[in-house]
Amino acid sequence: MSQTPLLSIVAAVYNGEKFLAQFFECIEQQQLDSYELILVNDGSTDNSLVVIAEWQERLQNVQVLEQENQGVSVARNTGLAAASGKYLAFPDIDDKLYPGMYRTLLEMAEKEHLDIATCNGTYVYEKRRESHPIFPLDRLPSTGVLPGHVWLKQALDSRKFLHVTWLNIYRHDFIRQHHFHFEPGLRHQDIPWTTEALLAAERVQYTSQQFYDYYIHSESVSHKPDNDDTLMRSARHYMKILEMLEAINQRYPDKVRHIAACRWQTPKKAWESSIPSIA
């Protein structure tokens, strides 16, 4: 491996013992020549560290950072501060990455000098519902290189866009240049991050290939049963997201002017993501 890895893969780990074996297998199957895997243990109380230690003997380039439990955003920021790769990725350990995902995105990014390379994925449900693409193929086909705000407009206009980091890789210098970080303690922190990253990016390309299974299950932080306390916390998160999105809109007025959905669909998505149904 070269001194500077081509890709830094940053993932938060909190009580992920049952998911880690599949996650490591997914990373191994990427067959990358130049990468580092940075795992941030966010105060796990299960055997996550035991599983990680076993896989460290099998995989090279695995770095483990420790912190008290502070949530996904802080864990990602900790990993981001330690990352040295030319590109960055932020997968979730309880999802599935298909072989070729990062190789494909890296080839796109290197060939076209991209700030962000992005792909499609699949919703996989724990019960009943059939799996289906995150971005319907008829609404969001593969693109050439686009300015980030143009891609954001197309994606929002599809009415099916999902604000997530884990379908993307980011050029590290681009992230440094704009001093991007994840908002500590914020549920659905990917909404403001993704919105601003796309508004700031000059070169973005999307492939409709489905490389990532997003599992919607009861143990996901985003899909836990809700009570009155969690509904109130969700409302506070929603208000914070709206404040952040409005500030982002004001930082990029010339670009937002051409994206009507930035004024309504992004806040709508924040509401849908942060406030579960109480019916």
Outline where the language-model segments fall:
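Cell-envelope/extracellular polymer assembly enzymes that use nucleotide-activated donors
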Residues: 5-8, 36, 192
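Short, well-formed alpha-helical segments that are part of the catalytic scaffolds
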Residues: 15-29
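Acidic helix N-cap motif at the loop->helix transition within catalytic regions
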Residues: 18-21, 46-55, 96, 100
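A conserved acidic beta->alpha catalytic loop
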Residues: 26, 41-50, 68
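Glycine-rich, basic loop-to-helix element that forms the pyrophosphate-binding segment
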Residues: 67-83, 93
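Donor-binding/catalytic cores of nucleotide-activated saccharide
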Residues: 72, 93-205, 212-231
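Short aromatic/hydrophobic "clamp" motif used to bind/position activated sugar donors
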Residues: 88
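C-terminal subregions of glycosyltransferases and related glycan-biosynthesis enzymes
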Residues: 215-279
